[in-house]
């Protein structure tokens, strides 16, 4: 069976393969990012989005793969064979998991359309001969201001505002209250 885990999201394994393998952060960094950004949604018994479901599956698969690697490391006596297995898991399976984690975290952070546009623009850039392309690759974080603002509004990260923020907002509240009383 030829299963493409990105198909339902409008992408493909081929499109993600345009990004070089060293582009993707380590699995540990990606897992930490997923936990920091979406821990509640990932641990929730309720369905949040297809990206959250895919992230859960990728995280579970990576955990099982690490269990297998630990078992192999403990039970395979030949050091050369053990090293081959560990290397294969880290290089091949690790890259696939890093791609999956990066894609779904990016979609949740920046929006699916922005990530797909980025993948297409990077694919065009990388396939253009160096003499004819701009020197710098497209950057995913170069987003319209509205996308960044909208994302921050959806996920309350801080329970209480910082003291500096509280001070800057209190005069506004007073002004708006005084305007209401004037109307």
UniProtKB/Swiss-Prot annotation:
Subcellular location: Virion; Host cytoplasm
Molecular functions per Gene Ontology: DNA binding; RNA binding; structural molecule activity
Protein name: Capsid protein
Gene that specifies this protein: C
GO cellular component labels: host cell; host cell cytoplasm; T=4 icosahedral viral capsid
Modification Phosphoserine, positions: 155, 162, 170
One family name in Pfam for this protein: Hepatitis_core
Compositional bias segments (type: Basic residues): 149-176
Motif (Bipartite nuclear localization signal): 158-175
InterPro entries, A to Z: Hepatitis_core, Viral_capsid_core_dom_sf_HBV
Residue stretches of each Sequence repeat: 155-161, 162-169, 170-177
Keyword flag Zinc-finger: no
Family of this protein: Belongs to the orthohepadnavirus core antigen family.
Chain intervals for the UniProt region annotation (Disordered): 136-183
Assembly, per entry: Homodimerizes, then multimerizes. Interacts with cytosol exposed regions of viral L glycoprotein present in the reticulum-to-Golgi compartment. Interacts with human FLNB. Phosphorylated form interacts with host importin alpha; this interaction depends on the exposure of the NLS, which itself depends upon genome maturation and/or phosphorylation of the capsid protein. Interacts with host NUP153.
Biological processes per GO annotation: microtubule-dependent intracellular transport of viral material towards nucleus; symbiont entry into host cell; viral penetration into host nucleus
